[in-house]
């Protein structure tokens, strides 16, 4: 509710901890309001007291009231009742715990079974301080072994010995009863106890069923100390409470009855269940009272037990589910809580909200990107509560009078006491009267801030802030560029809109979540939006070389460009008629000084090198220099979504707001051009010429013939299988290769045939729609259809469709589509095509569910990880995850890809380009000016400085090559130096041919100073220093190498001014790029990883023609990694070799054989069993010869061998391949079977390799007896054969089933070495890849590189190499998965995930087994999975949740400590009282004037110098405006009409005259950018618009009588009366006391140190504020302080403003507010007593003046200077209108200074926009001093006579 605090006056406490526990029977009775004892609900049509709908438990129907609290249906929350059970029963949720505790204590005396004082126990208690769950587990493990309650026997023996012995004392206490313990088993919902040993109880049976009653007795005997030892809590969770004796009856609100029309009420499931319990309970009581048989009672108790159990959980395994009469299972309490739709996830974590709208979206290219068009019907329905203040009462009164029926109206008035007046039902006129403090719920109007969202919300750019524009009709309209972050299209998508209900929310959305602020995504540091669709297509067409635009059309286009400055550029062609090129028009759209180099999509790489690399014949090199498109065709590479493109650069260089306008302007102008130009596509575009078709047919015919040939070869067995593949795989690969090749060849010939003007092609080339493949499929041939990565499989009887013959492997039968879409498919082709398409659809559907779950798990695992104020990254338990975010402490949004100039070049080039030689005079003279050369020659340490620079560069290069041994890493850093240097060259007009005046010594010292300022980790201790070094190492290396002396004097040629500007710019941009504390980087990382996962393919196929090994990729691999799976689909090692093995394939083969597991089966050709009784004379003819030779020297006793013979013939080829010898195999057989098998074998060189094996039997004598159970020899031999073939390992590692050997052809697997010359060289070593992993065994092999060899099984890496290695392995594996399909995710997100998974020192899986085993609070865990189990566990162990995380706070409806909620604000409430003085005499006087002191919400009262935002809250940029509407802007009076530009409030930037009854425009023009009294052109007496004779300003006009307290009139400025207490005679904007602006603000004076006239755009403290940039004017209304573009040089921040008074962070302590003190206290160092402005002799500063206190420079009416007749411009009066701080003696404003004439302190007469007469022009602006280089007096645009161009801001100009 937006109205908390209005409706409910009671203050709300913040929940700081949540204590879990079990409700004990006493407490249940205490909180109960009714004892429920009857199962009936009604009696005589009335709710029955003591029944299940007891009226004391809550309200029953709409009209009723609650008997307990007398509330009605909306107010009464419901109250618990209770019902007492006749017998105790088990609580099903606690059953497992009950069992555990039974096993820990003695069944008879309730003692712990272990000695509490035993060291083991004490250690456990110490170890598990707060973790009681762990404690129970460990104690339970100790007790499990005990079967006797110890202590009885020892007690008797020990006593006589030594009664004083402390041990005995302990024994006495610990002594148990010495009886044997039963073992317990759970059966269903019963517990059975069984005694194993013969118990000394004579009659007791050995096995009984424990009743809950008996267990309760045991539990009641446990002492409080023991309760603590078993991890429970005597106060909150006692063991006996786990047994139910009293049941709470939930309130009626929890189980409402459903009233169906025409029939009785349907009671809720819980009510039914409770009624069953009561009935059973009554029956049990009756039977007990009547003394029924024991078995009857037992049955009743079991039934009661069943009902109580199913009330809690209705899905108990082994129990029937309780059902309603109809057979529908009842919904138990557990089912109500768990799952997506349950209470936790469905109602607490996520709720349905009010003030939201949903409808279909439609495109509208004319809306700005941050605007959404809202239908009027929605605007009329959604309201915003606006607080009535004296400033907006008129406006709101008007809305209220219109009511709800007319559009800009209001729905409700909410009075201060919370009463609502509904304006729909014609209320009395008196009710409509508004008073300050009321709230008006007004309709949504233009300019409101809303949140727009499209599900699925995969990343933070799926919910962004927009502004509203009310449009007719019924759909949301949005700009096309914004569709990409939302992933929306206009084929019927719906989107949601939320209207925030408080100013704080609006401010937050506006300052953080608006679309322009999200242009760059931290996910991949690139823009998320680009130009799309028709605009993209047109921008390519328009920027081609041959596009010309004539004069009328040019005028038309300029009309569409809002930022046009009124100058038409020189046309490119003058005769015969003026023509402009398309490039010129595009240059007009580009804002400001941007420099970009890109290529067009068709750019050939060959053009980038060679002597003519600057010449681009196809106009494919896009060069934008100084905001001018010089060459190149603009396509999606320049204005799309790629990193480093034009849009990216504009956003980084000029700020998000200009970038946002740029998006909109491109669209309006280009679309206007396209409407005239036209773009269409038809069948004509798809038709190629005759020759092409012939070519295509021939290609396909040839391909089909090739396939037939391959099939022939396969039939004839001529096809050699490729290594690692079977014959069939090889065949398929070959065929696939042929067919894919055919498709590609036909496609490329089709594309070649299309002309330059083909519309298909123009869309593909510009990147707006389609790809090359689409073209070739439409024109040439659709190609091979695949299912599961293979050709269409045979369906039945060896055919794909009935139309083909059996075993047809031809292209047509297996799914090759040779027709194009244009020609149309044959029926069978169509069928195959549909098969391929269907698979795609299924894949997508399955993938969506998979990735959605992955995303949820990632978010849940990392949701509370955030950057803290100490710069570390921690989770909600404040456990450190990273020392610095992303290891460099920078925000992913501000970094860019940069290249390290020193990494790649070899030594010679490196020395040539980076080594400076100060002794080379010729070089110095050529590159440096005389002064510099002299300085170098005179300096004594110059040479050593330059030498130290060189050695530092060499060291940097060595480090770089160590960090990036491959030399090709993508280095991501802030501040793109190359571009900054380029900007500097443009701004300072650097001439690259002249020598420079920048001394090399200055360069070295400058760079060193700068690198000291780039602080990520502050602190002077050793650790901090090292951390700082690590975090900024790369940045420093980049700085030193790019800004080295040699580079500066030969390539960049910056002069010293430019160099200083550059250093300052780097520093401020680096500061800006530091990650903000409070940033929720965990959620960001989870989204950044989850979002690309949805784009991945689900199944990765074994691609055709690849013989290398197949690895799991895509979503399945991602799942394996984050689940930390123990068993992978394709476990694999990548083995790198060293020494000779790496180079020599034979040696590599040796290693391969050592690794690959080889069984006998793999080398066997065939086996056979023969009956061959005589060993010497064999029956097998071919063996005779070698057998007889073998037995010539008999060394065995042949009499015992069996007559059966196993003959194994081996495959010679495979033996050689595996490098095996016969001897090795014989050894293995001998090793396996010993002497039981008699083996003979042929020589290695024999024709056939044969083994002959016989069983060596025992002596004949023994054999007879055992004959019975012995199997026959031949059967036994068969078993041996099977065993030998499969299990006999010949060599290798059993886990590694196959090893592939290959020589890598891609660089990522090659070995990169650094040559002696210092260059990089990649060497293709042999590498082995395996199926199966055994890292430990492999690492111990010889000739293996143990450093690079790695496994893809992260569990194995953890076991073998430890946690740090596995962190790197996860990072590498994740990177492989993501980059496989060309995505890129910034390293910091991957690193964060790896750190979260490994921070604890073990692998934490991102599943319930990992996330829910952390020590976070129970509330967070139960919001993920296993809801009820976790809550039960928490109750048993009396856990406490500290409510620190995100989920817990959301569940409790509190602000989570994250983002803007992670800090507190200090507010001086006393000061706030003086914040807003509203003179009572003007409150109802037609217009309202507020003092300019500032409301409490204004920035002057905000925490002044929190280190991050140099002293301003993000919300209110204005000086003083009312909390609701921002009615007062710093200089622009009150605006009754909302949305005009100017002013400073973000909402209605109004600038109207305070009260002007007649003129609709008021005294100010509606768009004036907040200039007050004497501000230029607003109230100047001679200005034609506001002349004294103007009817509205006649002194006789009733509302302007000079003495009227409301609107007095001074002779010059009609609206200021001297007696009006709040209006000072000078305009508030330029008054000396106005904190927001003082003309002497040092930032603009030529003497100011920070504003050097030669360096217009840089002041040391300003991140990127350049006065020459058109939109950063002092008056630009929408600039927030945290915006990078605000800077101390903006007038609102003048250093004299109290916010910056150096002696006090916010304002000076002696000044209660800036109405009365303005922060200028005498102790403030800027105001010394000698300052001429405050001289005591000044006539206006009389200490005796009643209203002038020395600390408060107020204007008081009694001050002599301020009589209405006071001369307006009194040069001698330091307090005249002329200048509040002007005095003739002031050194800055000396009358002799040419720029300052006495009548004009601010504008010099030479400034082209200034005329020295007091009537100032509208265009004057404090920003331009005559010396400012960017502002030349001759510039025709800013002529004094041109009324509408204010140099400060073309958009918001005073007079338009």
Swiss-Prot record:
Q: Note the InterPro entries from the entry.
A: DNA-dir_RpoC_beta_prime, RNA_pol_asu, RNA_pol_II_repeat_euk, RNA_pol_N, RNA_pol_Rpb1_1, RNA_pol_Rpb1_3, RNA_pol_Rpb1_3_sf, RNA_pol_Rpb1_4
Annotated EC: 2.7.7.6
Record's CDD domains?
Answer: RNAP_II_Rpb1_C (cd02584), RNAP_II_RPB1_N (cd02733)
Q: Where is this region: Bridging helix?
A: 827-839
For the ligand (Mg(2+) 1), the binding residues are 489, 491, 493
Specify the enzyme's EC class, one word: transferase
UniProt catalytic activity: RNA(n) + a ribonucleoside 5'-triphosphate = RNA(n+1) + diphosphate
Which regions are flagged for Low complexity bias?
A: 1587-1856
Please tell me whether the keyword Ubl conjugation is annotated for this protein.
Answer: yes
Transferase among the record's keywords? Answer: yes
Q: Where are this protein's sequence repeats?
A: 1593-1599, 1600-1606, 1616-1622, 1623-1629, 1630-1636, 1637-1643, 1644-1650, 1651-1657, 1658-1664, 1665-1671, 1672-1678, 1679-1685, 1686-1692, 1693-1699, 1700-1706, 1707-1713, 1720-1726, 1727-1733, 1734-1740, 1741-1747, 1748-1754, 1755-1761, 1769-1775, 1782-1788, 1789-1795, 1796-1802, 1803-1809, 1810-1816
- Region ranges (Disordered): 1523-1856
Here the cross-link named Glycyl lysine isopeptide (Lys-Gly) (interchain with G-Cter in ubiquitin) sits at 1260
The UniProt annotation puts the region (Lid loop) at 256-268
- Keyword annotations from UniProtKB, A to Z: Chromosome, DNA-binding, DNA-directed RNA polymerase, Isopeptide bond, Magnesium, Metal-binding, Nucleotidyltransferase, Nucleus, Phosphoprotein, Repeat, Transcription, Transferase, Ubl conjugation, Zinc
Instruction: Give the disruption phenotype, in one or two sentences.
Output: RNAi-mediated knockdown results in embryonic arrest at the 100-cell stage and prevents the embryonic transcription of several genes. Surviving embryos exhibit gastrulation defects with decreased expression of genes involved in gastrulation.
Fetch the SMART domains from UniProt: RPOLA_N
Q: Where is this region: Rudder loop?
A: 314-331
The known PTMs are summarized as: The tandem 7 residues repeats in the C-terminal domain (CTD) can be highly phosphorylated. The phosphorylation activates Pol II. Phosphorylation occurs mainly at residues 'Ser-2' and 'Ser-5' of the heptapeptide repeat and starts at the 3- to 4-cell embryonic stage. This phosphorylation also occurs in the early stages of oocyte development and is not detected in oocytes arrested at the meiotic diakinesis stage. In the somatic lineage, phosphorylation at 'Ser-2' is mediated by cdk-12 downstream of cdk-9 whereas in the germline lineage cdk-12 phosphorylates 'Ser-2' independently of cdk-9. Following transcription stress, the elongating form of RNA polymerase II (RNA pol IIo) is polyubiquitinated via 'Lys-63'-linkages on Lys-1260 at DNA damage sites without leading to degradation: ubiquitination promotes RNA pol IIo backtracking to allow access by the transcription-coupled nucleotide excision repair (TC-NER) machinery.
Residues that, per the record, bind Zn(2+) 2: 106, 109, 149, 177
Q: What else is known?
A: The binding of ribonucleoside triphosphate to the RNA polymerase II transcribing complex probably involves a two-step mechanism. The initial binding seems to occur at the entry (E) site and involves a magnesium ion temporarily coordinated by three conserved aspartate residues of the two largest RNA Pol II subunits. The ribonucleoside triphosphate is transferred by a rotation to the nucleotide addition (A) site for pairing with the template DNA. The catalytic A site involves three conserved aspartate residues of the RNA Pol II largest subunit which permanently coordinate a second magnesium ion.
Protein's recorded name? DNA-directed RNA polymerase II subunit RPB1
Gene name per UniProt? ama-1
């Amino acid at each position: 509710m937006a109205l908390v605090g209005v409706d409910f006056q009671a203050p709300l406490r913040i929940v700081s901890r949540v204590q879990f526990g079990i409700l004990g029977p006493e407490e249940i009775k205490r909180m109960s309001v009714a004892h429920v004892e009857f199962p009936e609900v009604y009696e005589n049509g009335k709710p029955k007291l003591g029944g299940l709908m007891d009226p004391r438990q809550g309200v029953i129907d709409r009209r009723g009231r609650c008997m307990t609290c007398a509330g009605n249906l909306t107010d009464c929350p419901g109250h618990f009742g209770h019902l007492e059970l006749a017998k105790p029963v088990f609580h099903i949720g606690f059953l497992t715990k009950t069992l555990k505790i039974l096993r820990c204590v003695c069944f008879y005396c309730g003692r712990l079974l272990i000695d509490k004082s035993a060291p083991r126990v004490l250690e456990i208690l110490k170890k598990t301080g707060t973790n009681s769950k762990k404690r129970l587990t460990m104690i339970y493990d100790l007790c499990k072994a005990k079967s006797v309650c110890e202590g009885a026997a020892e007690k008797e023996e020990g006593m006589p010995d030594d009664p004083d012995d402390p041990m005995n004392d302990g024994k006495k206490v610990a002594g148990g009863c010495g009886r044997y313990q039963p073992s317990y088993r759970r059966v269903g919902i019963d517990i059975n106890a069984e005694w194993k040993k013969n118990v000394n109880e004579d009659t007791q049976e050995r096995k009984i069923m424990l009743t809950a009653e008996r267990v309760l007795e045991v539990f009641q005997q446990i002492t409080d100390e023991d309760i603590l030892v078993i991890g429970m809590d005597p106060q909150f969770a006692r063991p006996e409470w786990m047994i139910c004796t009293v049941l709470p009856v939930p309130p009626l609100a929890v189980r409402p009855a459903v009233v169906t029309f025409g029939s009785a009420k349907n009671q809720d499931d819980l009510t039914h269940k409770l009624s069953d319990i009561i009935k059973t309970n009554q029956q049990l009581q009756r039977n007990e009272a009547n003394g029924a048989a024991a078995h009857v009672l037992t049955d009743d108790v079991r039934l009661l037990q069943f009902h109580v159990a199913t009330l809690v959980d209705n899905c108990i395994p082994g129990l029937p589910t309780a059902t309603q009469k109809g057979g529908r299972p009842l919904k138990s309490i557990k089912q109500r809580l768990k799952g997506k739709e349950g209470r936790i996830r469905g109602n607490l974590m996520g709720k349905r909200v009010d003030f939201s709208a949903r409808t279909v979206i439609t495109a509208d290219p004319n809306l700005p990107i941050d605007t959404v068009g809202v239908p009027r019907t929605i605007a009329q329905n959604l309201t915003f509560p606006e607080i009535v203040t004296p400033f907006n009462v008129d406006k709101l009164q008007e809305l209220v009078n219109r009511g709800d029926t007319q559009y800009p109206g209001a729905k409700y008035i909410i009075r201060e006491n919370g009463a609502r007046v509904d304006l729909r039902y014609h209320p009395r006129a008196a009710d409509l009267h508004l008073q300050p403090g009321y709230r008006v719920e007004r309709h949504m109007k233009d300019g409101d801030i809303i949140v727009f969202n499209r599900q699925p919300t995969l990343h933070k750019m799926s919910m962004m802030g927009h502004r509203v524009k009310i449009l007719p009709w019924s759909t949301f309209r949005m700009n096309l560029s914004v569709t990409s972050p939302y992933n929306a299209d206009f084929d019927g998508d719906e989107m949601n809109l939320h209207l925030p209900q408080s100013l704080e929310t609006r401010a937050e959305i506006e300052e953080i979540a608006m679309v322009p602020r999200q242009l760059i995504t931290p996910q991949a540091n690139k823009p998320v939006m680009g130009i799309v669709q028709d605009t993209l297509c047109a921008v390519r067409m328009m920027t081609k070389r041959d596009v010309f635009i004539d004069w009328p059309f040019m005028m038309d286009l300029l009309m569409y460009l809002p930022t046009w400055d009124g100058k038409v550029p020189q046309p490119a062609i003058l005769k015969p008629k003026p023509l402009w090129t398309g490039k010129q028009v595009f240059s007009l759209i580009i804002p400001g000084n941007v420099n970009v180099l890109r290529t067009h999509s068709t750019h050939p790489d060959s053009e980038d090198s060679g002597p003519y690399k600057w010449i681009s014949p196809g106009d494919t090199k896009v060069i934008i220099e100084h905001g001018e498109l010089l060459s190149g065709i603009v396509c999606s590479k320049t204005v799309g979504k790629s990193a480093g493109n034009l849009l990216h650069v504009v956003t980084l260089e000029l700020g998000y707001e200009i970038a946002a306008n740029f998006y909109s302007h491109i669209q309006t102008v280009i679309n206007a051009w396209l409407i005239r130009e036209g773009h269409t596509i038809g069948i004509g575009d798809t038709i190629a010429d005759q020759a092409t078709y012939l070519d295509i047919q021939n290609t396909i015919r040839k391909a089909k013939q090739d396939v037939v040939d391959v099939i022939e070869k396969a039939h004839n067995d001529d096809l050699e299988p490729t290594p690692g593949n079977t014959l069939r795989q090889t065949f398929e690969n070959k065929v696939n290769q042929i067919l894919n090749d055919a498709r590609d060849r036909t496609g490329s010939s089709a594309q070649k045939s299309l002309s330059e003007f083909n519309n298909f092609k123009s869309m593909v080339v510009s990147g707006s729609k389609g790809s090359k493949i689409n073209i070739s499929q439409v024109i040439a041939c659709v190609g091979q259809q695949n299912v599961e990565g293979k050709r269409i499989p045979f369906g039945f009887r060896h055919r794909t469709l009935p139309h083909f013959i059996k075993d047809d492997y031809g292209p047509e039968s297996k799914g090759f589509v040779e027709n194009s879409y244009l020609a149309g498919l044959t029926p069978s082709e169509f069928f195959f095509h549909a098969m391929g398409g269907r698979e795609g659809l299924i894949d997508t559907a399955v993938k969506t569910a998979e990735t959605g779950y992955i995303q949820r798990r990632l978010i849940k695992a990392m949701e509370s990880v955030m950057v803290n104020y100490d710069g570390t990254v921690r989770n909600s338990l404040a456990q450190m995850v990273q020392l610095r975010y992303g290891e460099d402490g920078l925000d992913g949004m501000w970094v860019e890809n940069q290249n390290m100039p020193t990494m790649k070049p070899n030594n010679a080039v490196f020395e040539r380009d980076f080594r400076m030689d100060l002794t080379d005079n010729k070089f110095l003279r050529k590159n440096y000016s005389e002064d510099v050369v002299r300085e170098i020659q005179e300096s004594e340490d110059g040479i050593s400085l330059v030498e130290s620079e060189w050695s530092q560069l060499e060291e940097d290069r060595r480090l770089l090559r160590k960090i990036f041994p491959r030399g090709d890493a993508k280095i991501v850093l802030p501040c793109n130096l190359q571009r900054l240097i380029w900007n500097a060259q443009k701004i300072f007009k650097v001439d690259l041919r002249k020598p420079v005046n920048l001394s090399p010594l200055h360069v070295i010292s400058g760079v060193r100073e700068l690198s000291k300022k780039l602080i990520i980790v502050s602190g002077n201790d050793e650790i901090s220093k090292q951390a700082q070094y690590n975090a900024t190492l790369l940045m420093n290396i980049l700085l030193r190498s790019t800004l080295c002396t040699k580079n500066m004097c030969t390539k960049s040629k910056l002069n010293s001014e430019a160099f200083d500007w550059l250093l300052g710019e780097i520093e401020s941009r680096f500061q800006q790029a530091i990650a903000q504390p409070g940033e929720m980087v965990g959620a960001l990382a989870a989204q950044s990883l989850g979002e690309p996962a949805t784009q991945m393919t689900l199944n990765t196929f074994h691609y055709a023609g690849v013989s290398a090994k197949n690895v799991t990729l895509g979503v399945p691999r991602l799942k394996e990694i984050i689940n930390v799976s123990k068993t992978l689909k394709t476990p694999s090692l990548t083995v790198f070799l060293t020494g000779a093995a790496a180079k020599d394939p034979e040696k590599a083969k040796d290693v391969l054989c050592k690794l690959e597991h080889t069984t006998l089966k793999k080398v066997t050709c065939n086996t056979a069993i023969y009956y061959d009784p005589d060993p010497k004379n064999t029956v097998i003819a071919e063996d005779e010869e070698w057998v007889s030779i073998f037995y010539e020297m008999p060394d065995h006793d042949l009499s015992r061998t069996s007559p059966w013979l196993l003959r194994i013939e081996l495959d010679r080829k495979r033996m050689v391949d595996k490098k095996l010898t016969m001897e090795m195999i014989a050894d293995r057989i001998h090793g396996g079977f010993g002497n039981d098998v008699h083996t003979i074998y042929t020589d290695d060189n024999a024709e056939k390799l044969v083994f002959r094996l016989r069983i060596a039997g025992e002596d004949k004598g023994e054999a007879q007896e055992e004959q019975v159970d012995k199997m026959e020899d031949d059967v036994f031999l068969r078993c041996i054969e099977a065993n030998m073939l499969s299990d006999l390992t010949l060599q290798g590692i059993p886990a590694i089933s196959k090893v592939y050997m290959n020589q890598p052809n891609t660089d990522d697997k090659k070995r990169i070495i650094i040559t002696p010359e210092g260059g990089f060289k990649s060497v293709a070593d042999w590498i082995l890849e395996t199926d199966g992993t055994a890292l430990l065994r492999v690492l111990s092999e010889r000739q293996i590189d143990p450093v690079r060899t790695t496994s893809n099984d992260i569990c194995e890496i953890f076991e073998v190499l430890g946690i740090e290695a596995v962190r790197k392995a996860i990072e590498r594996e994740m990177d492989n998965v993501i980059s496989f399909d060309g995505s890129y995710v910034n390293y910091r997100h991957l690193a964060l995930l790896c750190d979260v998974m490994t921070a604890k020192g073990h692998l934490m899986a991102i599943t319930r087994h990992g996330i829910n085993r952390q020590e976070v609070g129970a509330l967070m865990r139960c919001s993920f999975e296993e809801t009820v189990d976790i809550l039960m566990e928490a109750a048993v162990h009396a856990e406490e949740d500290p409510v620190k995380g995100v989920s817990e706070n959301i569940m409790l409806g509190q602000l989570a400590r994250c983002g803007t909620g992670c800090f507190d604000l200090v507010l001086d409430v006393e000061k706030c009282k003086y914040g807003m003085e509203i003179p009572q005499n003007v409150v109802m006087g037609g217009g309202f004037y507020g003092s300019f002191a500032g409301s409490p919400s204004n920035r002057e009262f905000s925490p002044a110098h929190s280190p991050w935002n140099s002293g301003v809250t993000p919300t209110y940029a204005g000086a003083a405006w009312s909390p609701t509407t921002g009615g007062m802007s710093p200089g622009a009076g009150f605006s009754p009409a909302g949305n005009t530009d100017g002013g400073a409030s973000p909402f209605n930037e109004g600038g109207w005259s305070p009260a002007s009854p007649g003129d609709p425009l008021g005294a100010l023009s509606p768009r004036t950018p907040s200039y007050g009294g004497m501000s230029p052109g607003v109230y100047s007496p001679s200005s034609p618009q506001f002349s004294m004779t103007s009817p509205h300003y006649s002194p006789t006009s009733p509302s302007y009588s000079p003495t009227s307290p409301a609107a007095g009139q001074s002779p010059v400025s009609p609206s200021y009366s001297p007696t009006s207490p709040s209006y000072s005679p000078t305009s508030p904007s330029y008054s000396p006391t106005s904190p927001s602006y003082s003309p002497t603000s040092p930032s603009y004076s030529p003497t100011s140190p920070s504003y050097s006239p030669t360096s217009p755009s840089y002041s040391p403290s300003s991140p990127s504020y350049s006065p020459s940039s058109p939109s950063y004017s002092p008056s630009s209304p929408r600039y927030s302080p945290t915006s990078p573009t605000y800077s101390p040089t903006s007038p609102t921040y003048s250093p004299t403003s109290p916010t910056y008074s150096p002696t006090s962070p916010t304002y000076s302590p002696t000044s209660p507010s800036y109405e009365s003190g303005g922060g200028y206290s005498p102790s403030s160092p800027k105001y010394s007593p000698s300052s001429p402005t405050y001289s005591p002799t000044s006539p206006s500063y009389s200490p005796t003046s009643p209203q002038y206190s020395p600390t408060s420079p107020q204007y008081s009416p009694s001050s002599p200077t301020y009589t209405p007749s006071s001369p307006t411009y009194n040069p001698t009066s330091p307090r005249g209108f002329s200048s509040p701080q002007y005095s003739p003696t002031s050194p800055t404003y000396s009358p002799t200074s040419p720029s300052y004439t006495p009548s004009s302190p601010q504008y010099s007469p030479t400034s082209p926009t200034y005329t020295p007469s007091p009537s100032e022009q509208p265009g004057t602006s404090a920003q331009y001093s005559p010396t400012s280089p960017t502002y030349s007096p001759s510039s025709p645009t800013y002529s004094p006579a041109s009324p509408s161009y204010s140099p400060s801001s073309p958009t918001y100009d005073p007079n338009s």
